[in-house]
Amino acid sequence: MRFKDKVVVVTGGAKGIGACIAERYRSEGAYVEIIDKTPGNWFIGDIADKDVLEEFSKYVLKKYGKVDILVNNALPLMKGIDDCTWEEFLYAQRVGVAAPFYLAKLFKDYFPKGSSIINISSSRDRMSEPQTESYTAAKGGLTALTHALAISLGPKVRVNSISPGWINTTEIEYDGPDATQHSVARVGRPDDIASMALFLSSDEAGFITGENIVIDGGMTHRMIYHGDHGWSFR
């Protein structure tokens, strides 16, 4: 077991990608602590709240005295320039950028040598659909925060980010064009992201830090122009 007796913190770990990541670490022997707004058997709280983050960090450190791996996964609000208010935009940045920064700061002196931070960003950190400004800004900030933290916290802590594309967290099966538009002819699965998170936080990735890995089935590399190769813009 690669992570036996390691202490792993996962934000937004109640469902979806976060839940999958948490379960994968548990399956390899780790102690996993989750913080999420959703009611359940974990620390319940909104990571946009500074006081909640401080309370959560005290809880984790009192219980374990250290954190080996921090996974910043919690999902920011997605609203666009037409409807997103000033307060909502700032809230998205608190969840998506400020909370990952502050948790890294709170745990900074309690990371053992060889620790790892994994930031779950998004392929939207480099490409966009209309009306997604709050989310896109948060993910872009998180990707940039990754390389900044890697320099500040090294060599004790490695910091990397993952930018998922379309990851299906539902029970719906997607086929046809939804799948075949991807170069691998399928939509992503939470395990695709969890596998990379575990690799990046393992000793096998000991020479990787400050990096961003895109996992999107090739979508961000597909050049699309109206009228070429059957694509059309409507």
Language-model segments: residues:
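Substrate-binding pocket helix/loop in short-chain dehydrogenase/reductase
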Residues: 80-93, 178
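Short C-terminal tail/terminal secondary-structure segment
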Residues: 209-234
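C-terminal helical subdomain
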Residues: 161, 176-208, 215-217
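Active-site helix of classical SDR
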Residues: 104, 138, 146
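Alpha-helical segment proximal to the catalytic Tyr-Lys
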Residues: 109, 151-155, 206
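Conserved NAD(P)H cofactor-binding loop of Rossmann-fold oxidoreductase domains
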Residues: 73-78, 218
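Canonical Rossmann dinucleotide-binding motif of NAD(H)/NADP(H)-dependent dehydrogenases/reductases
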Residues: 2-31
